[in-house]
């Protein structure tokens, strides 16, 4: 799956260095996510092997910047009920935020779900993640509800906001935006 600027593709071992440098080592990227920062290059080499294994059986991908070929993020979806999908996380390294890549990723994910017969798409974000909230709204998702969750890393309570979009197929597998 690709756009003019990005490609969603399955991880390869040689991606460990760029995904580590751009995403996994960055606390500002992990802040609103449920994963921990990878401390060093050895940890990144181990993590890429787990990522490759995970992606073999899940609808999850690394995000590659088309111009540089570097792994700059990751994204995924899962079917939570028949024809109902939820994103499983969208992350971009801080140097790649604010370039429109998030919107391109989210649109690709929704188009992918349409191609699988998806009828509803859910997206969630922590209440404090204003950029993620703005991304949801900009892609036509509407707020549904919020719920309290406990951060598995810190044990702190946070508010998770859930957004939804009904997926409409144009007959060509493309969404109407």
Give the role of each language-model region:
Residues 23-24, 33, 52-55:
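Hydrophobic residues in alpha-helical segments
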Residues 28-50:
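Conserved GNAT-fold acetyl-CoA-binding loop/helix
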Residues 1-18, 22-28, 62-177:
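Acyl-donor (CoA/ACP) binding surface of acyl/acetyltransferases
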Residues 49-62:
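A short helix-loop-beta-strand connector motif used in the catalytic cores of GNAT acetyltransferases and
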């Amino acid at each position: 799956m690709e756009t003019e600027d990005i490609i969603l593709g399955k991880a390869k071992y040689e991606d460990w260095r760029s995904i580590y440098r751009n995403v996994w080592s960055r606390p500002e990227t992990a802040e609103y996510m449920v994963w921990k920062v990878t401390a060093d290059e050895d940890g990144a080499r181990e993590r890429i092997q787990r990522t490759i294994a995970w992606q073999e059986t899940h609808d999850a991908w690394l995000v590659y910047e088309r111009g540089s070929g570097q792994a700059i993020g990751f994204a995924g979806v899962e079917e939570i009920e028949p024809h109902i999908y939820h994103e499983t996380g969208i992350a971009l390294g801080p140097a790649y935020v604010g370039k429109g890549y998030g919107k391109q990723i989210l649109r690709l994910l929704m188009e992918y779900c349409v191609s699988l017969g998806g009828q509803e798409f859910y997206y969630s974000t922590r209440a404090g993640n204003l950029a993620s909230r703005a991304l949801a709204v900009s892609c036509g998702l509407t707020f549904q509800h919020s719920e309290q969750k406990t951060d598995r890393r810190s044990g702190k309570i946070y508010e998770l906001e859930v957004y939804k979009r009904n997926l409409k197929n144009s007959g060509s597998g493309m969404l109407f935006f």
